[in-house]
């Protein structure tokens, strides 16, 4: 935020908010980007996930200008070299994005690099918890390259243009 302020640009907004209640005016955004956050609406509200997810997209569409773009970034598997989901909730969410909301999808690798296995274990355990870290470290789902530990990560990128009339 401070870097943007120093550039004297006036066409940007940064805010922390619930995806279901975004504190900005209608039709103000050319692009809405959500990184690793909408999935938590599904995870934390699974008994009513479709209703809550629709609130998110109603809100995104409210703030998006006609012809604008929605870009969603989410995990497609930590500890895997190719996209793979162990989580059934995420599978439902991603299928909903693609089949019901008609988002396009691609995937990229976004691997993590650590100086040694102890550093990898400590940071992964803090961020991802014991189950996933144990799976990665104990099952040796990592690579050693140039004295570094590489943890594979696949990331999904979903996008679509606004359906609002211009």
PLM-predicted stretches and their roles:
Residues 50-66:
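A short glycine-rich, Lys/Arg-flanked "PGG" loop and its adjoining helix->strand segment in the class I
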């Amino acid at each position: 935020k401070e870097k943007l302020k120093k550039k004297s640009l006036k066409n940007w907004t940064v805010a922390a908010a619930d995806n279901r209640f975004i504190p900005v005016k209608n039709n103000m955004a050319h692009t809405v980007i959500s990184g690793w956050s909408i999935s938590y609406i599904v995870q934390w509200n699974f008994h009513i996930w479709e209703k809550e997810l629709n609130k998110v997209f109603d809100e995104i569409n409210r703030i998006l200008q006609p012809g604008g773009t929605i870009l969603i970034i989410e995990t497609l598997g930590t500890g895997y070299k190719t996209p793979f989901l162990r989580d059934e909730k995420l599978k439902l969410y991603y299928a909903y994005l693609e089949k019901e909301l008609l988002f396009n999808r691609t995937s990229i690798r976004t691997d993590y690099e650590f100086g040694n296995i102890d550093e990898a274990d400590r940071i992964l355990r803090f961020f991802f918890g014991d189950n996933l870290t144990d799976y990665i470290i104990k099952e040796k789902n990592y690579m050693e390259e140039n004295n570094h530990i590489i943890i594979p990560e696949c990331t999904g990128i979903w996008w679509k243009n606004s359906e609002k009339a211009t």
